Amino acid sequence: LKVSVIIPACNEADSLLPVIKEVQKMKPFEIIVVVNGSSDTTKEIAEGAGCRVVYYEEALGINIGRAIGAKKAKGDILLFLDGDIAVPHEELMKYTKAIETGHDIALNNLSWIMKRKVRPHPVSVAKYMLNLCLQREDLSIQALTAIPHAIKKTSAAKIGYENLAHPPLAHTIALLKGMSIVAPCSSDVIYTNKIRTTHKTIPTNSPFPISTNYIIGDHIQALAHLIEEKGIRGGLTDGDRNREVVSAYTPNVKRKTGVKYSAVIPAGEEKETIANVIKEVKKAGVEEIIVVANGADEVTVKRAIEAGATVLHYKQRLGHNVPRAIGAMYSSGEVCLFVDGDIVISAEHLRPYLEAADQGVDVALNNLECLLDEVHPIHSVSAAKYFLNIVCKRPDLTINTTTAIPHAIKRDVMEKVGYESLIIPPLFQLKSIMYGFMVQPVHFVDVARTNRIRKEHMKVKGLAASTQRILGDYVEAMAYYISQTSERGEFLPDIRRHDLLFEVLNNE
């Protein structure tokens, strides 16, 4: 099979020749250098080295050069590189070999980045989140965003050359088409990458540099495509949630007046813990305690009543977070504290949430940020939480969301955002931020180690059922966000020269 090597280059006079020299050792069919926006001798160097040069006076914008090179290439295998990073030819051969043995795409294996004892970069979080939503956790952060990578020419045509200008979108299309993607080699392009102005310049409406902004926008666009193809949960399970019960539910009692704090406690078979959970909530100063018993045994219900709670009784399990919404609708307090029936949390660890609400915090979250420094690589659910906060331009919230208990929410937030959104915790959080409410982590309670291991937490093949459901919640939140903003969210618009790419696509 013939190999075409594609190298987009802009002002790479200092670094291009070593890149070309390594490539020439592979004896490829052709080396295409797409020179664009260059004011130095990049073009002359490429021509002098015997490369096929495609020249544009203007800068094309990131990845447009790749797509143009791919369309113009005559080989059977397309190998993509950058003009500023020389990769040993022995490594490059591993990418082309993977295509020769029948795979469609061969990616650079960068999963080692996630194992370092540091917090993941927002771009790594976005890459991991996309692979998780595509149910390919095994791909970690492997992506078409990173070089080197190789694609079979016929597969590139099926993906669409125009889509190669958006690597996360191309990656998504490839997986949805059932293409075979592998990561046969680990080439270090992180420590060798040139720091550019776009890596440092931060636009006014964002906490992220320009390059990060673009890449996150590209990942939102890829998720928009997944949602369009697979529905608002991206094809991920909703668990056994009974959503109808919430829309049909209107409390037939009038709200009590003068109640400051309510607590909502969903409970299944929690006879061992329920009485102590209620006792601590009372001790924290909560006046109204509502236990939403769903699929609960009689002992749990009896103990909840004896402990002084109001019990709303449903014979069937309602599914995750549905009881939260029902309990919140029934409750009367100005502030609602959410805890679970199977984790006993002492009053001293519950009070900070109520106090934060008194001091002006609208949504007071459990501060689990320390897990970012303790768990490497980041857990899939934590990655989804972090991604949501990155999309909301609140990276300061890290992995803190209303998915984790305990948390406290003010009544006016629930009234404005809508009680039914409590069924999908990330959607509730996203809406709260979009409405301008103050969302803050306030106190750490270790719920990770005390959480009961249930059957749905077990991995059988691919993702555990609980992980799939939680990821689906985050995709659903993203679907709402995209519907309210754009296919790139509120990240930098795409100003790349697609017009010049389409000229090539239409003329060749």
Predicted regions and their residues:
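N-proximal low-complexity "stem/linker" segments adjacent to membrane-targeting elements
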Residues: 1-22, 236-279
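A conserved acidic beta->alpha catalytic loop
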Residues: 35-43, 293-301
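Glycine-rich, basic loop-to-helix element that forms the pyrophosphate-binding segment
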Residues: 56-73, 315-331
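Conserved nucleotide-sugar donor-binding
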Residues: 74-75, 127, 144-160, 332-333, ...
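Short aromatic/hydrophobic "clamp" motif used to bind/position activated sugar donors
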Residues: 78, 336
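The conserved acidic donor/metal-binding loop of glycosyltransferases
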Residues: 82-87, 340-345
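Short, flexible, basic/aromatic active-site loop/helix in glycosyltransferases
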Residues: 103-113, 120-142, 362-372, 379-400
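C-terminal catalytic/acceptor-binding lobe
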Residues: 176-258, 434-508
